[in-house]
Amino acid sequence: MQACRRCIAPPLFCALKILVAITGASGALYAQRLLDNLNPREHEIHVVMSNYAQQVVAEELPGGLKFPDGVKPHGLKSMNAPFASGSNPPDVMVVIPCTMGTMGRIAHGLSEDVLLRAADVVLKEKRKLILVPRETPLSLIHVKNMELLLLAGVTLIPANPSFYSGAKTVVELVDTVVARVLDHIGVPNKIAPRWAEEKE
């Protein structure tokens, strides 16, 4: 796992400070499955949601978003959140799912709320920023924003499920994307089959 300032006997274990940001793109299940597979007993997990994300969650997830015990939610205007300053940045920030509007604001350094401020902090402190865009088709503006972000070192993992896994449910399809997100965070997982992987 990657090194961080909270390493305990590396490389055996590395506790990470992870911020999960949820925006208003359709695909709230991606965020739920990511949270389901991050262990707050092993990592420090924070969550922030945009206003539109709360509406989408209400429509797409019966019963709402479920936070595992130990996950720390923050309001969108909570500028005193522990990840809102370069003196205390997260090790990893994941925006899942990520709207094109959020992507554009991050690409151009806008920080009108704590979600966007956190992304700005992660970029300037050279920590890991992962965006999971869910939009189709893409405009030239979207692609140019993606180019800016890639040049800045951002990891883009489009919410495109793989079908070679033989998934039989929506959750299993979603997990093929979430598995890749976990890989890039640095969290070992077996939630989805790997290409050409021998079955146990």
Please provide the spans of the model-predicted regions.
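Cysteine-centered motifs
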Residues: 4-7, 14
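A cross-family phosphate/adenosyl-ligand binding-site feature
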Residues: 12-200
